[in-house]
């Protein structure tokens, strides 16, 4: 069982934000919940061992409401 750390972003997360969240899973050996607000509230859960490219391709929303 892993500890969950929560990170917040202003607006849509950039690649740098995703990299930092994935790095935190390795450094702290924990799961990271990345949360942000953009015309609503979004969050994704990043588990240890995932790469930021996979997180970006598979877990990030494809479209946002306008």
Language-model features: where?
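Acidic, low-complexity, intrinsically disordered interaction modules
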Residues: 8, 12-57
């Amino acid at each position: 069982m892993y500890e969950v750390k929560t990170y917040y972003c202003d607006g849509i997360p950039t690649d740098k934000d995703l990299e930092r969240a994935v790095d935190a899973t390795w450094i702290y050996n924990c799961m990271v919940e990345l949360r942000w607000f953009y015309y609503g509230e979004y969050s994704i859960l990043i588990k240890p061992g995932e790469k930021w490219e996979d997180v970006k391709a598979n877990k990030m929303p494809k479209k946002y409401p306008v």
